[in-house]
Amino acid sequence: MNAFSIVGKITEMPILKETTNGLKTCELPVRVQRNFPNSDGVYENDDMVIEVWRGHAETVSASCKIGDYVGINGRIHSRKYQKDEKVYLNYGFVAEKIDFLR
């Protein structure tokens, strides 16, 4: 099973873009508080960028604002690329369901 689920706060406005194939997309920056404190008792945050596609991208870019809370379910994807004869692997997060938590 390939799935993730987060609840976090939007930190920047997403910009709606269109691919050469006509698909709508945007990147949604979200700050998520960790569910455990560090050694000083402080709950730190993780900043993530979530890929949003098609109708979800249009809705998110038109409806959200900085500071809004969202719940996101999705999948993790990987991309391989080669540089200087070394193979690298990048991971990204793709939204499949977005709930606006206002």
What are these regions (language model features)?
Residues M1-R102:
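Single-stranded nucleic acid-binding surfaces, predominantly the OB-fold ssDNA-binding core
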